[in-house]
Amino acid sequence: MKIHTVALVAALCFSSQAFAEVSLTTGAGYANMAKELAKAFSATSGNKVTENFGGNIGQMMAQIANGNGANVVISDEGTLKSLKTPVQLTDIHSLGNTPLVFIWKKGLNLKGVSDLGTDKVKQFAYPDPKAAIYGRAAQQYLDNLGPNTVTKDKVMKIASVPQVTAYVVKGEVDAGFVNRTATRANKEKIGGSEELTKGYAPIHMIAAVVGHLFGVVAGEG
């Protein structure tokens, strides 16, 4: 399912009514996607969106709790539910599911993820499962392949989606698991890709407005 721009526009419109300025945050792995959606909102509404990106979503939510001003959050629903934070989110809009994507470096002739267990792939990477939803999805996918499909010496865990993508683009690893946005942004720099829709828990994206923080309700002075 494609990410629903209309749903994000609705969330940003609500935020623009509740706050003086729309300020958007997300984790590093979703930054490019969030930028695309914010651009669509600005084109539709004429309102500017301030972008607050940098760390993983846990770090960004901690910044909101400390008063950095972000009032709209984009992330996957599972990660947001797992975070321990005083930030309460309201006006939640579904953006749809987004897939795990297997990519490989230029010059490597692969059919797709089915070649992962062959000698064609000497080493591959995926994001740290403790820090990134795509890392957890990749781990689930690999676990479902069976214990003997991929040897441990092939696997490299890297902090985030952008870093995994960079390793593949530079040829430091043969392949990696990332997201659709990273794949599209680097389509001219990689050898190929395959979207995976099974073998892991669905990654459901949402946009939500910061509704309650330290006793202050959105829209109330």
Give the residues covered by each predicted segment:
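Sec-dependent signal peptide recognition
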Residues: 2-9, 17
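Repetitive helical segments and hydrophobic/amphipathic motifs
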Residues: 11-13, 220
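Intrinsically disordered, low-complexity segments
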Residues: 13-14, 43
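Sec/Tat signal peptide C-region and signal peptidase I cleavage site
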Residues: 14-20
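Exported/periplasmic ABC-transporter solute-binding proteins
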Residues: 21-46, 50-221
